[in-house]
Amino acid sequence: CEYNSLKVLKAFQKNNISDMHFNGTTGYGYGDIGRDTIERVFAEVLEAEDSLVRTQFISGTHALTVALFAYLRPGDIMLSISGKPYDTLDEVIGLVENDSSLKSYGVQYEQIELKDDDFDYEEIKNRVAKNDIKLIEIQRSRGYALRSSISLEKMEKVIKTIRAVNKDVIIMVDNCYGEFVDKYEPTSI
């Protein structure tokens, strides 16, 4: 707890965060110093390349939906390697009929189940080797499934396995309920 608190505090200090960064803006938000600076803080704390922090994202499912629709195009394949994602994504993916789902736009969905509370590394490696996957989704939290959350050690191992086969595939981690429970985040891997 103290380690992560200090990491956040240092990022606030490095970016000189003050009350002026939390003032409202008008118009389209061009030159919104508060938004831009807070996004730098989030990226630094999470050791990410960049971040998108908006009050307009009303839930984690909303943020995931925006990311999926940004990355995936008709003919692309999304692969979940931690089993089925949260039920809230069923309509987004197209597991439940929805005229606005990824499936309705021509995006295919596949999943690989966990094996004894761990990734099925061999199946993942074989599937990724076909070189037709656009995005791999990992749900760290157990969600509604009867399994343990995925440790960062297992996640690091599977990401290295994937990168050894395909360095360009997009790997998206749903880290819901996993923030700040370890010294580092999935974006640090």
PLM regions and their residue ranges:
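Long amphipathic N-terminal alpha/beta scaffold segment
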Residues: 33-51, 63
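Conserved PLP-enzyme active-site core in the AAT-like
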Residues: 8-9, 13, 18-21, 29-30, ...
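N-terminal amphipathic/basic leader segments beginning at the initiator methionine
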Residues: 1-9
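Short glycine-rich or small-residue beta-strand-to-loop segments that form or flank ligand, phosphate
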Residues: 21, 25, 52-55
